UniProtKB/Swiss-Prot annotation:
Gene Ontology BP term (one): methylation
Listed GO MF terms: protein-lysine N-methyltransferase activity
Organism: Staphylococcus aureus (strain COL)
The protein's name: Ribosomal protein L11 methyltransferase
Origin: domain of life: Bacteria
InterPro entries per UniProt: Ribosomal_L11_MeTrfase_PrmA, Ribosomal_PrmA_MeTrfase, SAM-dependent_MTases_sf
Recorded family membership: Belongs to the methyltransferase superfamily. PrmA family.
Ligand binding (S-adenosyl-L-methionine): 160, 181, 203, 246
Taxonomic lineage from the root: Bacteria, Bacillati, Bacillota, Bacilli, Bacillales
Gene3D superfamilies named among the record's database cross-references: Vaccinia Virus protein VP39 (3.40.50.150)
UniProt gene name: prmA
Protein's cellular compartments: Cytoplasm
Gene Ontology cellular-component annotations: cytoplasm
Catalytic activity entry: L-lysyl-[protein] + 3 S-adenosyl-L-methionine = N(6),N(6),N(6)-trimethyl-L-lysyl-[protein] + 3 S-adenosyl-L-homocysteine + 3 H(+)
Amino acid sequence: MNWTELSIIINHEAVELATNILENHGSNGVVIEDSDGLINQPEDKYGEIYALKKEDYPDKGVRLKAYFNEMTYDDKLRQQIKDELLNLDELDQHNVQFSEQIIAETDWENEWKNYFHPFRASKKFTIVPSWETYAKEADEELCIELDPGMAFGTGDHPTTSMCLKAIETYVLPQHSVIDVGTGSGILSIASHLIGVKRIKALDIDEMAVSVAKENFRRNHCETLIEAVPGNLLKDETEKFDIVIANILAHIIDEMIEDAYNTLNEGGYFITSGIIKEKYEGIQSHMERVGFKIISEQHDNGWVCLVGQKVSE
């Protein structure tokens, strides 16, 4: 079986909504290649192990790569996706580009691994692919062994890095953590490495739960993290000290009240996946519900907010 790689170059303002359209139409993962990441490469303060390659990024804007099963990707679906994208108010119609290529099953399964190498994601955390060998550079370094699978991120996105930095700052061993939209499980593993004993990882996608469980096994914490399917926090009855959600902004907006109600007094809501054009609305909503915003990080057009539950 082959796969169709649909490549779209668009402006930054349309990235979140375009990604949502692709995922809603059945894309098996979306790769985001942001030209800002090449122009504004992070300082080498965390000892990044490899440099970004110019040929992997568009000259300007953002390249989205979506992957569709050849059995379901037909002319009707192709046109439907294109029509919905071109109808986005945020889209710059003059600079959008579409292209496609066919990827054989064997290439699809392995080619992406060529771009995933060990890297320092934050001051403490280093992400290590499960198929590579890596030696710690310092005793305090915390290594997360990761095999994200084809449909989940490798941890190098700015939103993940900012969440890891927030975990370093606000999560303590005595805390309890719930990770909403866990994906590969990277943020739950980071919390475990900090020393947290009670961790629950949720994802609406059962494939994500399966991938997360395998990564928990690789990091020797499969019996210490509860990984279950879950629709955000709608059915959650337990209380936690930390709620983490690195998901899309419109989904975060839906769960702010539930996050507040799930937290113990003084607990923290760590959330990212928010493009800069959306963060003020998310921040205002959090404040209306009762959160005190105590941290705001920005990185290449993405934002991470930390709100604390503090009653009047």
